[in-house]
């Protein structure tokens, strides 16, 4: 039996943090008013254990144009050229809380269940130009720190798997999510760690929704993102058809006030070009 906990490492910032002053042995900081703060805990030192991603064999470096125009919004997003990056401001104390929750899962499930956790770095870890790096902490340092605190639980190294493919479309430019291809590489890393079968990507049919503009335009209203849509590429099994049960409901003041009867329909919904809901065509 396998228990899995997956986490993306940051969410949209809704508040403006004060500028931190981190010690030399902490992840980089230096965010001015309007950006997410980098890790700044001083009560916890960095782990001395070997980090999971130290053995990364980088096949390619990301293509970063240092001359691209950079705009930093007041909600912690940097628009670099035609790519939007959510600035990372995690902390070791939050990492400790997360590791504690995972350890409690393992304790509750017992020795008969293997528990895995896989923390996913966001795109700013790989695609920041030098002018933006000072505004972000190291996600790798924080991931390694979380994994060092796990007890009888396996931390899956998705970081290395993604870093090997940074010149491929593993993250979306106009959305805060990763792309389905990035999710595929991370899932492959999990399958290897768990020792479970995993199909080659050739077993899937590639589909494309053109002119996709994702959540980052909604967060920033930056016209550069709107005028530079991207292809949303996703993959569906060639030999298996999936359906799911849907519920439509009405929310009012955070409460469900109406719903219809459940109905079955295709899992992979076909959206037209330019439809911002295209991300719903896959589960990452």
State each model region's role.
Residues 1-284:
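Extracellular glycan-modifying ectodomains
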């Amino acid at each position: 039996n396998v228990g899995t906990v997956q986490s993306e490492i940051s969410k949209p910032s809704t508040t403006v943090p004060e500028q931190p002053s981190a010690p030399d042995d902490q992840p980089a900081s230096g965010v001015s008013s309007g950006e997410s703060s980098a890790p700044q805990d001083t009560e916890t030192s960095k782990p001395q254990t070997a980090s999971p991603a130290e053995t990364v064999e980088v096949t390619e470096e990301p293509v970063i144009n240092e001359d691209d125009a950079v705009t930093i919004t007041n909600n912690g997003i940097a628009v670099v050229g035609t790519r939007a990056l959510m600035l990372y401001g995690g902390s070791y104390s939050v990492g400790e809380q997360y590791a504690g929750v995972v350890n409690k899962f393992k304790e509750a499930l017992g020795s008969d269940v293997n528990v895995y956790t896989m923390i996913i770095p966001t795109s700013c870890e790989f695609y920041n130009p030098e002018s933006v790096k000072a505004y972000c902490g190291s996600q790798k340092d924080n991931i390694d720190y979380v994994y060092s605190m796990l007890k009888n639980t396996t931390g899956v190294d998705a970081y290395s798997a993604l870093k090997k493919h940074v010149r491929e479309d593993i993250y979306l430019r106009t959305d805060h999510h990763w792309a389905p291809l990035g999710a595929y590489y991370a899932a492959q890393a999990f399958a290897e760690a768990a020792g479970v079968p995993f199909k080659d990507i050739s077993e899937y049919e590639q589909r494309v929704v053109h002119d996709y503009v994702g959540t980052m335009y909604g967060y920033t209203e930056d016209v550069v993102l709107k005028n530079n849509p991207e292809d949303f590429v996703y993959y569906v099994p060639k030999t298996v058809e999936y359906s799911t049960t849907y519920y439509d409901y009405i929310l009012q003041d955070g409460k469900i006030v109406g719903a219809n009867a459940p109905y079955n329909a295709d899992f992979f919904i076909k959206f037209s070009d330019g439809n911002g809901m295209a991300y719903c065509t896959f589960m990452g």
